[in-house]
């Protein structure tokens, strides 16, 4: 591969625009995936959590006046996938528990589901963070931005899967009756 050391402002703007398009397309694909796999309420909750992850990660970079380059865009795209994976695990358990605990409301079901998946979520995030911290410390200057963005994203993504995506289902009035009706179609 050809290595480029310096990128002019015009090329840089084009690359940033391409990165924004890539993030938008990935968010749209995730929305469609969740809509098909679960229900529209779940897709809205997951997209809000993903926007949260992207905005917080890029916002921290902006507040710290750190450069946003292609490796950061790649990290953000990876964060979107990572966070979606966490959210899907919790949503899948919520869907199972909606059928299992038909008398409970969505807040109680979400709480049970999060508690059932919490150890998996924490262990996965912790091992990922250990790998990212070693890349950040030992990886050299070229990997610092990427690994820092990923560290932020894993922390924010884990938080949003638990505290943003799942509780949002309450505001969309998800319950076992609405889910059972949609599964009969």
Sequence positions of predicted segments:
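A structural signal for conserved, well-ordered secondary-structure elements
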Residues: 1-185
């Amino acid at each position: 591969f050809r290595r480029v050391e310096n990128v002019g402002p015009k090329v840089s703007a084009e690359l940033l625009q391409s990165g924004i398009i890539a993030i938008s397309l990935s968010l749209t694909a995730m929305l469609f995936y969740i809509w098909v796999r679960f229900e529209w309420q779940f897709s809205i909750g997951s997209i809000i959590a993903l926007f949260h992850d992207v905005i917080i990660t890029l916002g921290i970079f902006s507040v710290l006046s750190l450069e946003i380059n292609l490796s950061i865009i790649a990290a953000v795209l990876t964060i979107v996938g990572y966070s979606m994976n966490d959210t899907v695990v919790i949503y899948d358990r919520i869907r199972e528990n909606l059928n299992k605990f038909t008398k409970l409301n969505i807040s109680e079901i979400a709480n049970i589901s999060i508690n059932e998946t919490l150890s998996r979520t924490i262990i996965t995030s912790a091992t990922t963070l250990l790998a990212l911290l070693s890349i950040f410390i030992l990886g050299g200057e070229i990997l610092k931005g990427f690994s820092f963005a990923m560290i932020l994203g894993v922390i924010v993504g884990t938080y949003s899967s638990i505290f943003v995506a799942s509780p949002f289902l309450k505001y969309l009035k998800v319950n076992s009756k609405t889910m059972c009706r949609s599964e009969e179609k």
